[in-house]
Design a protein with these regions (language model features):
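Non-catalytic, conformational "gating/processing" segments within enzyme and secreted inhibitor domains
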Residues: 149, 156, 161-162, 169-173, ...
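An aromatic/glycine/proline-enriched structural segment found at the starts
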Residues: 228-284
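Bacterial Sec-dependent N-terminal signal peptides
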Residues: 1-23
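Histidine-acidic residue clusters that define the catalytic metal-binding segment
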Residues: 23-32, 123-126, 133, 183-227, ...
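M16/insulysin-pitrilysin zinc metalloprotease superfamily fold
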Residues: 84, 125-160, 326, 344-374
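M16/MPP (pitrilysin/insulinase) zinc-metallopeptidase core fold and M16-derived inactive scaffolds
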Residues: 54-126, 189, 196-200, 317-351
Length: 374
């Protein structure tokens, strides 16, 4: 089945070669629009679950945009989004977002959640019972408040400092991969914004930042031109579009808005080598990256970009097949081996061919030579 899929992809490559600069046709089942304030929305109806829909607000905002005195605040802000807003105050008259959602069967941590990464922050309210119009309206109001109307109360900020600190402690205590990544980034990304950009930030700043610094970050970067509303599920697309336009059009776009930059990654004349150790990492892993520039966003709607994606998949698949054949030897030269082509670690502005393999302590050079020789 897999080989047939890649054969079909190869045939498709031959067919589209003459139309590479053309844009891919948009799926008509998607409703895509942009409000006057710059906010984009995407709506799609499906019948996967009757009477259920998922709601998202996605933001092109992450820890890479933090100043040195803001390290960790993109992630901190994500936590604060559940601790009071214009229409969800956590009072008897105005329940919190969490209380309102759970009262309607939307579980916090499962259907109500968020994540912060280097370049994006995404909030979701999923498995929403949409047959009740009032529930739909309140769900959109949650996204509306996340966009621009968080309270960011002093007392709530201080309470959340301890929560973040415990999350940081737990991650460092139980996640060797997290600690190794923190060691690797300053070496691999030396001299770039990416050398210190992990969303968890630094606890010195989390424990002591002034309230105003968090509010400044929020109002600088949480704005319509960097946000998108996404609704997918058992909804009437026309009605949902009207609701989105009514709820989100009034959110203001700040004057003299800061430019949202995407930061480059330096090329290197000599190979960069990072040798990392952690007591909880029992297997020696070797990863080889061969970098290349990422495709500009403006070109990602073209047939050329789609074709190049198929080519990358074919290359990674064929190398993977060679690695599997190598692992059939007795004894196996590597403990594990894999190949992929995609984003270079945490940076959107670079892609890479990545070859990863686990090596035997007693035969490091032999494992390395076998994997590279494929």
């Amino acid at each position: 089945m897999i080989k047939r899929r890649f054969f079909n992809a190869f045939v498709l490559l031959l067919l589209v070669t003459g139309a590479l600069a053309q844009n891919v046709t948009t799926d008509n089942s998607f409703r895509i629009g942009r409000l006057k304030n710059g906010m984009t929305y995407y709506i799609r109806h499906n019948n996967k679950e009757k009477g259920i829909a998922d709601f998202y607000i996605a933001q092109r905002v992450g820890s890479i945009l933090e100043n040195p005195d803001q390290r960790g605040l993109a992630h901190f802000l994500e936590h604060m989004a559940f601790n009071g807003s214009k229409n969800f105050k956590n009072t008897d008259a105005s329940p919190s977002i969490v209380h309102w959602c759970e009262a309607h069967g939307i579980k916090f941590g499962t259907n109500l959640n968020a994540y912060t990464s280097i370049d994006e922050t995404v909030y979701n309210v999923s498995a929403v019972p949409v047959k009740n119009p009032a529930v739909v309206d309140s769900t959109l109001l949650i996204l509306h408040d996340w966009s621009h109307y968080l309270d960011l109360d002093d007392k709530e900020i201080d309470k959340e400092r301890g929560v973040i600190h415990e999350e940081w402690r737990t991650r460092r205590a139980g996640m060797a991969s997290q600690r190794l990544m923190e060691q690797a980034l300053p070496i691999i990304y030396k001299g770039t914004k990416y050398e210190d950009c992990m969303p968890i930030g630094t606890m010195e700043i989390v424990d002591h930042f002034p309230y105003k610094v968090l509010r400044d970050y929020y109002h600088k970067w949480y704005r319509p031109d960097l946000q998108a509303i996404i609704v997918v599920g058992d909804v009437d697309v026309d009605q949902m579009e009207k609701k989105i336009q009514a709820v989100f059009s009034s959110i203001p776009m700040p004057a003299n808005a800061a430019k949202r930059n995407y930061y480059p990654v330096n090329d290197n004349d000599k190979m960069i080598v990072a040798s990392l150790k952690d007591s909880e990492q029992p297997i020696m892993l070797v990863t080889l990256y061969m970098k290349r520039d990422a495709t500009p966003d403006a070109e990602k709607s073209t047939i050329r970009y789609q074709r190049d994606g198929y080519v990358d998949d074919l290359i990674a698949y064929m190398v993977g097949e060679r690695l599997d054949e190598m692992q059939d030897r007795n004894p196996k030269p590597c403990l594990s081996a894999s190949a992929r082509i995609g984003q270079f670690l945490v940076s959107r502005t670079k892609d890479a061919f990545t070859l990863s393999f686990g090596v035997r302590q007693e035969n490091i050079k032999g494992s390395f030579d076998a994997a590279i020789g494929t």
